[in-house]
């Protein structure tokens, strides 16, 4: 799968599961990205559900993006997704989407929806 070219070369990231201590940085990215934001309680309520998963992208031990998605029987649904303003146009979002695509299965989940 190919995505549009970025203005700069992709940054090197570590993409991992979101953990509770990430919330301060995630909330900063959320508030800088959206007019109507999720609260910390919104994030936590969602992540407490068995089918809801969070991931973060880190560059040099700093969180530069996050994604919250739900697992459904035949698809993955992205609920919330943002990249820090200073990290945009560097392939962060594309790398996170590619990681999500890797989680698709030919037998079960075959699509990603927003």
What kind of feature is each model-predicted range?
Residues 3, 8-10, 17-88, 94-107:
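Acetyl-CoA-dependent GNAT
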Residues 78, 112-114:
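Conserved hydrophobic beta-strand within the GNAT/NAT acetyltransferase core sheet
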């Amino acid at each position: 799968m190919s995505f549009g070219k970025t203005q700069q070369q992709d940054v090197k990231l570590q993409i991992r599961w979101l953990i509770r201590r990430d919330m301060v940085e995630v909330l900063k990215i959320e508030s800088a990205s959206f007019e109507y934001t999720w609260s910390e309680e919104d994030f936590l309520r969602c992540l407490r559900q068995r089918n809801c998963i969070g991931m973060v992208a880190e560059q040099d031990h700093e969180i530069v993006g996050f994604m919250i998605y739900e697992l459904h029987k035949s698809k993955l649904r992205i609920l919330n997704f943002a990249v820090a303003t200073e990290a945009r146009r560097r392939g962060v979002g594309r790398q996170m989407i590619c990681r999500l695509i890797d989680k698709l299965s030919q037998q079960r989940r075959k699509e990603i929806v927003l």
